[in-house]
C-alpha cells in the first residue's frame, strides 16, 4: 500500500482517478522496472573453485545444478596416489563439491655433492619450487650458481642451473714495494692462507726506513690478500718540547715511526691534553702536543678578626651592669613615690590649716 502511495505521488496521475488507463500503464512500467532491478534468486553456481595444483579443462559461462567441471594437474604437479576425484559438481544448493586438491608436487632428481663441497636443501625436500644450496670447503671457492631451484623444463622436472664447481683458492704475488721486500718473492702462486712478510731495506741516508702498514699479508680468497702492501719510507718527527714540562719516558735524539714520549708538567702547572704522544706515519705527533698551564693563584679568604685585649674601659664606654640598671630603676620609682607623698602631705596640711582658720573666724 505504501509503495502504491509513493507511486501515486511520483506519477503525474490525477489523485481522483488513480486507475485511469494512463496511470495504470505508468504503474505497470515502474513495477516491471523494479522487478528487473531487484536481485532474483539464482539456481546457478558461481565460477568453479580454484586450486593450487589443478586447473579446469574447460570453462562455461554459467553452471546449473548437476553440471560437472573436469580438472587436470598444473605443470609441476601429478595425480595423488591413491587417486582422488579430479572433478567438481554444481550442487542443488548452488555450491561445488568435492572441494579438495587431487594433485601433488613432482620432484627433481637428487644432486650429488660437488668435489670439495656440499649441497643442502633448506626446504627439506627436492619438490617443485624447492631450492638447493651449494657451499665449498675451506680453501676453495665456488664457480657457478650457489642456489638452484626445482622447476619445470618442458615436460620434465629439472634444476634451474647446472651444479657449480669448487676450485682451490690461489693468490697472485702481492706486489713489490719501493725500499722494501717480502718473503718467497720468487713464487708465482700462493695457496690459501699462505703468508708473506715484508721488511724494509737499509737506507743510504742518515735516517732509516720505517715500515708503515701491515708487515704480514695472508691469502684469504681468489687473488685476494688480507690487506694492501705496506710502505717503506722515512718517518721522523720533530723533537717534542712542552713549555713548563719535561719528558719522563721515551728519551732520544731522533724520533721515528711509532716512537712514544710521555710528559709531565713542572710544579705549579697542570697538564692539558694527553700525557703520551706517538710519532705518526706523516711525521707528526699524534695526538696534538699537550700544554702545561700555570695554576691559578687561590684567592686569600678575608681575615677573621681575632680576640682583642683592650685596656680598662672609660667611664663613658663602660656599660652598667644589669644589677645597676635594676637599682637605678628602683631609685627613680622611689623618688617619684616620695614626691607624690610629699605633695599629698602638703596639700593635706594646707587644707587642715585653712579649715581651722575659717572656724576661728566664725566664732
Curated annotation (Swiss-Prot):
Query: Which residue spans traverse the membrane?
Result: 330-350
Regions of this protein lying in the Cytoplasmic compartment:
351-363
Q: Spell out the coiled coil positions from the record.
A: none
Q: Which regions of this chain are Extracellular-facing, per the record's topological domains? A: 45-329
Q: Name one GO molecular function term.
A: endopeptidase activity
Query: Known post-translational modifications?
Result: N-glycosylated. May be O-glycosylated.
Region of interest (Disordered), ranges: 290-324
Q: Does the keyword Glycoprotein apply?
A: yes
GO BP terms = complement activation, classical pathway; innate immune response; negative regulation of complement activation, alternative pathway; negative regulation of complement activation, classical pathway; proteolysis; single fertilization; T cell mediated immunity
| Keyword terms, alphabetized | Complement pathway, Cytoplasmic vesicle, Disulfide bond, Fertilization, Glycoprotein, Immunity, Innate immunity, Membrane, Repeat, Signal, Sushi, Transmembrane, Transmembrane helix
Q: Which residues form the Sushi domain?
A: 45-105, 106-168, 169-234, 235-294
Fetch the CDD domains from UniProt.
Answer: CCP, TM_EGFR-like
Entry protein name: Membrane cofactor protein
**Subunit structure of this entry?**
Interacts with C3b. Interacts with C4b. Interacts with moesin/MSN.
Q: State its location(s).
A: Cytoplasmic vesicle, Secretory vesicle, Acrosome inner membrane
Q: How does it sit in the membrane?
A: Single-pass type I membrane protein
Q: Which InterPro entries match?
A: CD46, SEZ6_CSMD_C4BPB_Regulators, Sushi/SCR/CCP_sf, Sushi_SCR_CCP_dom
Q: Does the keyword Metal-binding apply?
A: no
Provide the function of this protein.
Answer: Acts as a cofactor for complement factor I, a serine protease which protects autologous cells against complement-mediated injury by cleaving C3b and C4b deposited on host tissue. May be involved in the fusion of the spermatozoa with the oocyte during fertilization. May act as a costimulatory factor for T-cells which induces the differentiation of CD4+ into T-regulatory 1 cells. T-regulatory 1 cells suppress immune responses by secreting interleukin-10, and therefore are thought to prevent autoimmunity.
Q: Which residues are glycosylated?
A: 60, 86, 296, 299, 304, 308, 314, 316, 319
Query: What cystine pairs are annotated?
Result: 108-150, 136-166, 171-219, 200-232, 237-279, 265-292
Q: What is its main location?
A: membrane
Name the PANTHER family on file: PROTEIN CBR-CLEC-78
Amino acid at each position: 500500500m505504501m509503495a502504491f502511495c509513493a507511486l501515486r505521488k511520483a506519477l503525474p496521475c490525477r489523485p481522483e482517478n488513480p486507475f485511469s488507463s494512463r496511470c495504470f500503464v505508468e504503474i505497470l512500467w515502474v513495477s516491471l522496472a523494479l522487478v528487473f532491478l531487484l536481485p532474483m534468486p539464482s539456481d546457478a553456481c558461481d565460477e568453479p573453485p580454484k586450486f593450487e595444483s589443478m586447473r579446469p579443462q574447460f570453462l562455461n559461462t554459467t553452471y546449473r545444478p548437476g553440471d560437472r567441471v573436469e580438472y587436470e594437474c598444473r605443470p609441476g604437479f601429478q595425480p595423488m596416489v591413491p587417486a582422488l576425484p579430479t572433478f567438481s559438481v554444481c550442487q542443488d544448493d548452488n555450491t561445488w563439491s568435492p572441494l579438495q586438491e587431487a594433485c601433488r608436487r613432482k620432484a627433481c632428481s637428487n644432486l650429488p655433492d660437488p668435489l670439495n663441497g656440499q649441497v643442502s636443501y633448506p626446504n627439506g625436500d627436492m619438490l617443485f619450487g624447492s631450492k638447493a644450496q651449494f657451499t665449498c670447503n675451506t680453501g676453495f671457492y665456488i664457480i657457478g650458481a650457489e642456489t638452484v631451484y626445482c622447476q619445470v623444463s618442458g615436460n620434465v622436472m629439472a634444476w634451474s642451473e647446472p651444479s657449480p664447481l669448487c676450485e682451490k683458492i690461489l693468490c697472485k704475488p702481492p706486489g713489490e714495494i719501493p725500499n722494501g721486500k717480502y718473503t718467497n718473492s720468487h713464487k708465482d702462486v700462493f695457496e690459501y692462507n699462505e703468508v708473506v712478510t715484508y721488511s724494509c731495506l737499509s737506507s743510504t741516508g742518515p735516517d732509516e726506513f720505517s715500515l708503515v702498514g701491515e708487515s704480514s699479508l695472508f691469502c684469504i680468497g681468489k687473488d685476494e690478500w688480507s690487506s694492501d702492501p705496506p710502505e717503506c719510507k722515512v718517518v721522523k718527527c720533530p723533537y717534542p718540547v712542552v713549555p713548563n714540562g719535561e719528558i719522563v719516558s721515551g728519551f732520544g735524539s731522533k724520533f721515528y715511526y711509532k716512537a712514544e714520549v710521555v710528559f709531565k708538567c713542572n710544579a705549579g702547572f697542570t697538564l692539558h691534553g694527553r700525557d703520551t704522544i706517538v710519532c705518526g706515519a706523516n711525521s707528526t705527533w699524534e695526538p696534538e702536543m699537550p700544554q702545561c698551564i700555570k695554576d691559578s693563584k687561590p684567592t686569600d679568604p678575608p681575615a677573621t678578626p681575632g680576640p682583642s685585649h683592650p685596656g680598662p674601659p672609660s667611664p663613658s664606654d663602660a656599660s652598667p651592669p644589669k644589677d645597676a640598671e635594676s637599682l637605678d630603676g628602683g631609685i627613680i620609682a622611689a623618688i617619684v613615690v616620695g614626691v607624690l607623698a610629699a605633695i599629698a602631705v602638703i596639700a593635706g596640711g594646707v587644707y587642715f590649716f585653712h579649715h581651722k582658720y575659717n572656724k576661728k573666724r566664725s566664732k
